[in-house]
Structures are given as structure tokens and as C-alpha cells.
UniProtKB/Swiss-Prot annotation:
Pfam family, one: Ets
Ranges annotated as DNA-binding: 777-859
Compartment list: Nucleus
Signal peptide segment: none
Similarity section: Belongs to the ETS family.
Protein known as: Ecdysone-induced protein 74EF
The keyword Nucleus belongs to this UniProt entry's keyword annotation: yes
Organism: Drosophila virilis (Fruit fly)
Length: 873
């Protein structure tokens, strides 16, 4: 097989210079005589034999080229259809197949070729070789003594194969002029493979080599080979890598695009728009003096997989290769096998990439699930660590007992339903609240009897959440249903939402969750039975939780606003207070702040006095009723997974309590009560849950385990002597805010509950709420009471205009202290109380008096109040 040797590029007459842009006609003696010495000295006498073999192979290869041409044309049409669907703008070039349409014309005598070689001569590279055998990886460098370049420009076979196609001039038609051979099949393969790479990543590259002989040139011109690299980007870019003066058969406009990276100018056919039509790119005619069929066949076979390796060539790398010998058929077979192996490796790599992506997606989903339940898991570990008396043996027992939890759920729920029915008939009668004079003078509690609402003493002003006397609140958060519920809770009536508790039970049953249904049934059966108000130090937990829950729902404070410090600080309350919590009847006072969960006080009361289990369970029922009545329809949103998790954790707490009871340690008993009482709120205080969902979930969990959790404090210490499986779990409030009415958390005496039937609600929405005599709760009522008491009027407060309802705070500090004593808030000051008074402006209870300090006006003054002469002191 003939080759283009370095002898064609090297001539002694050139003074040791590479041919570069010189005329090689002087190096070739005759254009009609093909001398082996001038053509290829390495071939020598064997050139004639190789030429005969080449003629036989050429005929066979031409038939193969025709077949491949048809197949590649079909592939090109398919790629073009895909490109037309993907590309919406004509400005995008798409692929090299549509951008490159080179019609080679003889340009031997044109001025553009001179400009081209002038440009190439100024470049920083030299031509080391014209042709390299593409089947071999090893690059053989000849004439190293004349090599002025380093080996950095030499690329391997695989890198050179990354170019899309090549047409190399042969030497069989050296003496023939104006002979044109169409190598459309090769160019079609260029278009087909360029469509894949060009449309995919915009970096498809095609390396085209053209060679020919013209009528005005000598036979040496057929030896010239030019390489063109075509890159497909947003704009057409054609880089002429190197070429020779007599050998370039490209148009001048194409050659001038050498260093223009964003040139959309004329292409080979002179379109002037930088783009080619599909028909033009499908048939690219290359005018050539000759073609080497064997090399063309190898190049065409090489370009089948070059689109998968085109990323090996850098955008600015110049593919210059050394000349080497011809490969044997065995080497070609090895090369074909190597290409198949590369294809298999690439397919495996793609499969691995897809598997990695799937694994990453699964990991992300697992991380999201961990984020959803991560908070509850963390709290579970914290609660376990707080119990310092838990041994490793007990921990192993807990793990075994957790596995048996599923078998015990049905019995827990059945016992819960039966126990709820027992507790329905045991409502709590709360002691009554003293009059204002007794409160201020330190008198004792007396005359516990029911008082009904009347408008004969204090008027008809509605109560307000601002009467807690803490700070400013949102005006839009008050009024409406929450306030009505608050009033009815104070009256000892079931709230209006209690009538829909049966609907909540039906909604819970729709979720196929027995625990939720049991909680809804317990909420329907439980009601408040509060008579009048207690002394501030004697407020029960259920009243505190009911008022806090109602007000917090109207404000919209998050459920984990203050966290749960009761489980840690309240647990050690017995030791800090200096009272043995195991001693019956010895009260263990709270050492926690006002904002701790009510569960802390409830658990300590349970461990400090006997016979309070009924009250605690009644309080639990009331809280469940409050939580269920707020959003009964949201019970459906509680997932079965959350309920199972709650029940499992409650069973876990039960096992901890039983193990601690065996240790017979009073401190461990108190800690277990704290741990059990604070569980439902801690389990669900995740930041992303809504407070209504948490309330329903916690209520369902507490109801499911209410009948099964046995008091751990009722062992030898006799802390709780309630018969049966009395529960000590006190459901904490779903939220804690500044308005939590902390005086309700104080300890005090309790009376045993009397069986009563629940009263039906009598007040509806929109009805003005009236207060009761001697139980002033709201700030405006408190001030109105002071104005009717000669002990304080006009000493601390007085009327300035009785008819208009204008009054003045004579001693604002004293009034604020009295209000703080009334609300059991010793840190109350006028600044805090004044914010509550200003809140009444928005409620329409008080009116602002301009220009006067400490002066306020009642909008609607009751006419039947006690008249006091405030003029004299």
C-alpha cells in the first residue's frame, strides 16, 4: 500500500527546512514518472507490487463504500429529523454535518492560498508529518535529526480517531489532471457522526484531509494533504490546521475563516450564512486527484465510534501525527475488537452512572425521612439518657419488650375504652374563688357555691385575653370562637366544639386507627365541671391547660415554643425543694419556671399526695376534649405510622416505669413519672408539624395508653393509692406562651370529684359575655371593681367623669401591683398592664383620652355599678 513519506516533505534544496508553505514542484522531477525514490523510499522496489494489490482491493472497497453510503445516508436522515425537533432556532448550527459543505475547487493560483500559508507560517507549529497509520497506537518518528518540534504535538491513534473523517490523497493517479472522484460515502459518515456529537455537546470535531493535483501544478501537488478541523458551536468555526500551497483545494472564503472563532461567513459553497441545508450536507463533493481506498475504508470504520471519543481532543490541540508502517490484517482485527471492548466499557459506565444516580436519589429520600422523624428520635434518646438508673440489662429488656408491643396494642385500646367509661362519671368540683376584698386583705376561702353570670354588678363588658396582663397581643387573634370557648371553659360548660366530638370520633374511625377513635370517644365524654374560679394558688391543671390551649390557638404560637423543661428540672424538684417525694402527703413544690409544661406540676402532685389520680385523669380527658374540639377534621391527617410510633414509645415508657418500680427508689419513681408525663409532647414537637396535628396526635397517644400505664409511684411509697390501673400520664399543653396563666400551675388542695352530668352549652356565638360577682378575671373588670371599692377609690384610682366613664389611675404603680397580686404575677408593672389597657382600644372596651396621662375611658359604662364619691380623699 503506497504511502506519503517524509521524502515528499523533505528536499535538500530547501536548506533543511520543512516544506511549510513552499512549492514542492522543485522536489518532484517529473509529474508523469512515478519514481519509488521520490514517492516513498521506504517502499523501494515493492511499490509496484503494492500498487497492483491496491487496484484489486480498490474495486472491492468501492462496492463496500456504496453499501455503507446507503446505510449512512439513512442514519443521517434520522439524525437530522431528531435535530429538527430539538433545535428551535436557526441560529444554532446543530451539527457539523449541516455546517460543513465543502466543495473543493482548484485554487492553486489564488491569492487566498498565499494568505493562508502566510498565516500558517506565522503559527507556532511546524509540519512534522502528513499521514499516520490510524490503526496503530505507536507513533514512529522518522528523521528525528530534522525534527524541530517536541513530541507534545504527537497524538495517539485513539486521539486521532476522535476526528470525524479523513480523505487522504493516494499516489495512483499522479499524472492525471482534472480527474474528480466523489467520496460522498465518507462525507456522509462525517455528517452522521457529527450529528451525534455536534447536537449532543457542541464539541464535535471533524478532521478532513483533502489532496489533489491540478492542471497547472506538477505531480507533486497530489502529495499535498490538508487537514481541516470543524467544531460545531453556537456559530460556525472552521480552523485550518495546516496545509500546503499547491495542495489546498478549499475555497478562499473557507480558508479565511482560520482564526475567526465566531465567523458565520461563507462556507465551502459560498452560502454566506454559515449554515448548510440538509441536502447540501448530505452530499459533499470533494474534488480530488486521487483517493486511497484502503485508507478511506479504515478511516470510515474508525469513525463509527469516534463520537464516543471525541472529547479526547482539546479545542486548541493540533492533531499532528507521525508516519508509520501499514498494519497487518491481524492488527486491524485487534483494533476492531478493541473498539468493541470500548463500546462495552462505555455501556457499563453508563449503567453504573445510572445506578449511582438511583442510589443518590434513595439516599436523599432517606435523608428526608430522617429529617421528618429525626426530632422524635433525638428526643427519645434524650429521655432515655435522663434516666440515670437504667442499667444495660434493663435496656436489653426494653428492646425485647418493644418487640411485643404490637401484640399488646389491642388489649391497651380495649382497656382504655373501659377505663374512659369509668372516668366519665367522675367530674371534678373545683373550689371557688374569693371576693376581691378577701383577696386583697388576705382573707380565707369561704362559701363554695355556684354563682351564675349576672349583669347587675359589673356590667356587660366582654372579657379579653389581654386581661392576663402580660404584653401586647395581636388584635386579630382575639374574639370569635376561641373567646367563646374560653368563656364556656370558665363557666364550667363544654365548649361549642365539644358537640362535634362525636364527629371527631367518626373522622378518627375513618383512618382505621383504634387509638384515634378511642381518643375521640374520650374527648366526647369528657367535659369541664368548674364551678367558680379558684384562688390563684389553687387553680387546677385542667383549667390552666384549657385556657392556655384556647388562647394559644387563637394567637397561633408554635407548639414547641418553650420546649419541655419540666421533664428535666421538674424531675429533680423533689430533691431541690428539700422534701422527700416518696413521703405521702408531703408536697413537692415546683422549682421550675412559670413556663414549664403543666406535666411537671402534675407529676409532682401525683408523687406528693394521695387520691389525686382521679383529678389527673379528668384533666387528661379535658385536654383531649380541648385538643380534639379545636380541629376534629384534622384527625384524618394523622398518619398510621405516627400513631404506631406514639404507642410504641408509650409502651417503652411503661416498661421503664415498671423496671424503676422494682428498684424501689423514690427519686427514680419521680423521674419515671416525669418521663412518662412529658413523652407525648416531646415526641411530636417537631418544628415542621402544625400545632393542631400535634395536639391530635398527642391526644390519641395519651388516650391509647391511659388505661395500660400503671403508676410507678404507687409502689412502696404509697404516693398514689388509686385502685385499678389508674394512669398518671398528664398530657401537657400543646403550646406554651407568655399568656399561659402561670398561677394555675401552683400547688394546692383538691376536693374529691362528685358525679355530675355534663351541662349543655347555653351561650352561642356573638352573645356578649358577662362576668360574675366576686370573680373579676379581666383587667377592665378589675379596674371597675377598684372604682367601686372605697378602700382603693380614690386612693389608687378615681372617676374623673362618671357619666362618660372617664377614670384616672392615681397611683399607677399601686394599681399594677394590685393587678399582679390578683393574677399571681409579682413582677407586674404599669408598662405591662398599660399594654393590656391599650389592647382594649382595639377591642372597643376602652377609649383613648388625648392629652392626659394615665386617663382612660370606658366605652360602655354599666349603669348599675356602685356610686362612690371620688372627689374627697
Amino acid at each position: 500500500m503506497p504511502f506519503i513519506d517524509d521524502a515528499l516533505l523533505w528536499c535538500p534544496d530547501n536548506d533543511g527546512r520543512l516544506v511549510g508553505g513552499l512549492d514542492l514542484a522543485t522536489c518532484i522531477t517529473d509529474d508523469s514518472t512515478v519514481d519509488a525514490e521520490n514517492i516513498n523510499p521506504t517502499i523501494g522496489a515493492n511499490s509496484s507490487t503494492l500498487q497492483q494489490q491496491q487496484q484489486l482491493q480498490q474495486q472491492q472497497l468501492q462496492q463496500q463504500q456504496l453499501q455503507q453510503q446507503q446505510q449512512q445516508l439513512q442514519q443521517l436522515q434520522q439524525h437530522q429529523q431528531q435535530q429538527q425537533q430539538q433545535q428551535q432556532s436557526a441560529d444554532l448550527c446543530g451539527s457539523a454535518a449541516r455546517n460543513v459543505n465543502v466543495v473543493v475547487e482548484p485554487l492553486c493560483g489564488s491569492d487566498s492560498s498565499d494568505e493562508l500559508f502566510r498565516t500558517l507560517s506565522e503559527s507556532n507549529f511546524e509540519i512534522e508529518s502528513l499521514l499516520s497509520d490510524l490503526a496503530t497506537v505507536e507513533v514512529k518518528v522518522e528523521n528525528e535529526e530534522n525534527n524541530n518540534n517536541n513530541n507534545s504535538n504527537v497524538i495517539s491513534d485513539n486521539d486521532f480517531a476522535a476526528s470525524q473523517a479523513a480523505v487522504v490523497a493516494g499516489d495512483d493517479l499522479l499524472a492525471k489532471d482534472n480527474v474528480q472522484l466523489s467520496v460522498q460515502g465518507l462525507v456522509d459518515s462525517v455528517g452522521a457522526r457529527s450529528a451525534d456529537s455536534g447536537s449532543g455537546n457542541g464539541h464535535g470535531q471533524a478532521l478532513l484531509a483533502f489532496g489533489s493535483a491540478t492542471a497547472t501544478a506538477t505531480a507533486a501537488s497530489s502529495r499535498m494533504v490538508s487537514f481541516v478541523t470543524c467544531r460545531t458551536t453556537e456559530s460556525m468555526q472552521i480552523n485550518i490546521l495546516f496545509g500546503f500551497r499547491l495542495g489546498f483545494l478549499l475555497p478562499c472564503d473557507l480558508l479565511n475563516n482560520n482564526n475567526n472563532s465566531n465567523n458565520n461567513g461563507s462556507n465551502g459553497n459560498g452560502n454566506g450564512n454559515g449554515r448548510c441545508t440538509p441536502e447540501e450536507s448530505r452530499f459533499v463533493t470533494v474534488t480530488s486527484a486521487s483517493a486511497n481506498p484502503l485508507l478511506v475504508e479504515k478511516l470510515m470504520s474508525k469513525c463509527l465510534n469516534i463520537d464516543k471519543r471525541n472529547d479526547k481532543l482539546d479545542d486548541t490541540e493540533i492533531p499532528i501525527v507521525k508516519q508509520s508502517t501499514s498494519p497487518s490484517p491481524h492488527q486491524q482485527q485487534q483494533q476492531h475488537q478493541h473498539q468493541q471492548q470500548q463500546q462495552q466499557q462505555q455501556q457499563q459506565h453508563l449503567q453504573q452512572t445510572q445506578q449511582q444516580q438511583q442510589q443518590q436519589q434513595q439516599q436523599q429520600q432517606q435523608q428526608q425521612q430522617q429529617q421528618v422523624f429525626g426530632s422524635a428520635t433525638t428526643l427519645l434518646h434524650i429521655k432515655t439518657e435522663q434516666n440515670a438508673l437504667l442499667t444495660p440489662l434493663q435496656q436489653s429488656q426494653q428492646q425485647q419488650q418493644q418487640q411485643q408491643q404490637q401484640q399488646q396494642q389491642h388489649s391497651l385500646q380495649a382497656n382504655n375504652n373501659a377505663h374512659q367509661q369509668q372516668q366519665q362519671q367522675q367530674p371534678l368540683a373545683i373550689p371557688h374563688r374569693p371576693l376581691l376584698h378577701n383577696l386583697l386583705s388576705g382573707g380565707a376561702i369561704h362559701n363554695p357555691h355556684h354563682r351564675n353570670y349576672t349583669t347587675a354588678t359589673t356590667g356587660s363588658f366582654p372579657p379579653s385575653p389581654a386581661d392576663s396582663g402580660v404584653s401586647d397581643v395581636d388584635s386579630s387573634s382575639s374574639g370569635g370562637q376561641p373567646c367563646a370557648d374560653e368563656l364556656k371553659a370558665r363557666l364550667g360548660m363544654p365548649t361549642t366544639a365539644a358537640t362535634s366530638a362525636s364527629a371527631a370520633a367518626a373522622a378518627a374511625a375513618a383512618t382505621h386507627s383504634a387509638a384515634a377513635a378511642a381518643a375521640a370517644a374520650a374527648a366526647a365524654a369528657a367535659h369541664l365541671h368548674t364551678g367558680t374560679f379558684l384562688h390563684p394558688n389553687l387553680y387546677q391543671n385542667n383549667a390552666a391547660n384549657s385556657l392556655r390551649n384556647i388562647w394559644n390557638r387563637s394567637v397561633g404560637v408554635p407548639d414547641n415554643y418553650y420546649g419541655n423543661s419540666g421533664s428535666s428540672s421538674g424531675g429533680g424538684g423533689g430533691g431541690v425543694g428539700g422534701v422527700n417525694p416518696g413521703t405521702p402527703g408531703a408536697p413537692s413544690y415546683l422549682t421550675t419556671s412559670y413556663f414549664n409544661a403543666p406535666a411537671a406540676a402534675s407529676s409532682q402532685r401525683s408523687a406528693a399526695a394521695n387520691g389525686f389520680g382521679t383529678h389527673q385523669h379528668h384533666s387528661l380527658q379535658h385536654q383531649q376534649q380541648q385538643q380534639q374540639s379545636y380541629a376534629p377534621q384534622q384527625q384524618q391527617q394523622l398518619s398510621h405510622h405516627q400513631q404506631q410510633q406514639q404507642q410504641q414509645q408509650l409502651h417503652h415508657q411503661q416498661q421503664q416505669q415498671q423496671q424503676q418500680q422494682q428498684q424501689q427508689h423514690s427519686q427514680s419513681q419521680l423521674a419515671a413519672a416525669q418521663l412518662a408525663s412529658t413523652h407525648p409532647h416531646q415526641l411530636h414537637s417537631t418544628p415542621h408539624d402544625t400545632h393542631s396535628t400535634i395536639a391530635n396526635a398527642a391526644a390519641a397517644a395519651a388516650a391509647a395508653a391511659a388505661a395500660s400505664v400503671v403508676s410507678s409511684s404507687s409502689g412502696r411509697s404509697g404516693a398514689i393509692s388509686v385502685a385499678g390501673s389508674q394512669s398518671v400520664i398528664q398530657q401537657p399543653a400543646t403550646s406554651s406562651v407568655n399568656y399561659d396563666l402561670s398561677y394555675m400551675l401552683e400547688l394546692g388542695g383538691f376536693q374529691q370529684a362528685k358525679a355530675k352530668k355534663p351541662r349543655k352549652p347555653k351561650l352561642e356565638m356573638g352573645v356578649k359575655r358577662a362576668s360574675r360577682e366576686g370573680s373579676t378575671t379581666y383587667l377592665w373588670e378589675f379596674l371597675l371593681k377598684l372604682l367601686q371599692d372605697r378602700e382603693y377609690c380614690p386612693r389608687f384610682i378615681k372617676w374623673t367623669n362618671r357619666e362618660k366613664g372617664v377614670f384616672k389611675l392615681v397611683d399607677s404603680k399601686a394599681v399594677s401591683r394590685l393587678w399582679g397580686m390578683h393574677k399571681n404575677k409579682p413582677d407586674m408593672n404599669y408598662e405591662t398592664m398599660g399594654r393590656a389597657l391599650r389592647y382594649y382600644y382595639q377591642r372597643g372596651i376602652l377609649a383613648k383620652v388625648d392629652g392626659q396621662r394615665l386617663v382612660y375611658q370606658f366605652v360602655d359604662v354599666p349603669k348599675d355599678i356602685v356610686e362612690i364619691d371620688c372627689n374627697g380623699v
